[in-house]
């Protein structure tokens, strides 16, 4: 039992090793990817304030406030993300993906595409098709349950 968790742990470790050259972690990469996808979906220019707040990240990733605060603090210290005070409510800060953050997100994503291809080479063509079909079904089921897609 627990094979999915075991695979998750191994993939996270492999991802963190790969991301060392970008000086970010898997969790930080996920936040950068989320902000980049959100900017693209809303036609927000990189470096411009978005309508994404810390609370959105907490809900989307199922993380606690202190965890997301720590992730954002580290990303901000690396100049990958900025926080912008929201004019309508000064307690809220909008998140901004910096150009540097966007570039790291783009470069690191290319490596994940390659990593995925290498992992799938473990299987024959037929096994790959079945495996991807099963993963897509699982993803769709979980995404509906949580009401999001990534």
Give the location of each predicted region:
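N-terminal leader segment of winged-helix/HTH proteins
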Residues: 1-22, 78-80
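Short, locally clustered residues in the helix-turn-helix/winged-helix DNA-binding domain
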Residues: 5-8, 33-40, 109, 136
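Charged, amphipathic alpha-helical coiled-coil/dimerization segments
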Residues: 12, 43, 73-133
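N-terminal helix-turn-helix DNA-binding core of bacterial DNA-binding proteins
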Residues: 13-67
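C-terminal regulatory/oligomerization modules of transcriptional regulators
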Residues: 42, 48-49, 126-150
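Short, hydrophobic-biased segments on the C-terminal half of alpha helices
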Residues: 54, 72-73
């Amino acid at each position: 039992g627990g094979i999915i968790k075991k695979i998750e742990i191994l993939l996270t470790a492999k991802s963190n090793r790969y991301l060392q050259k970008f000086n970010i972690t898997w969790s930080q990469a996920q936040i950068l990817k989320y902000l980049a996808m959100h900017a693209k979906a809303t036609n927000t220019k990189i470096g411009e304030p978005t309508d994404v707040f810390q609370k959105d990240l907490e809900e989307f990733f199922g993380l606690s406030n202190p965890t997301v605060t720590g992730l954002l603090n580290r990303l901000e210290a690396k100049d990958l993300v900025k926080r912008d005070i929201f004019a309508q409510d000064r307690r809220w800060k909008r998140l901004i993906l910096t150009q540097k953050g966007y570039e790291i997100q783009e470069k690191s994503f290319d490596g994940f595409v390659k990593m995925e291809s290498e992992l799938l080479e473990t299987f024959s063509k037929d096994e790959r098709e079945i495996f991807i079909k099963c993963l897509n079904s699982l993803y769709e089921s979980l995404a509906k349950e949580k009401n999001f897609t990534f």
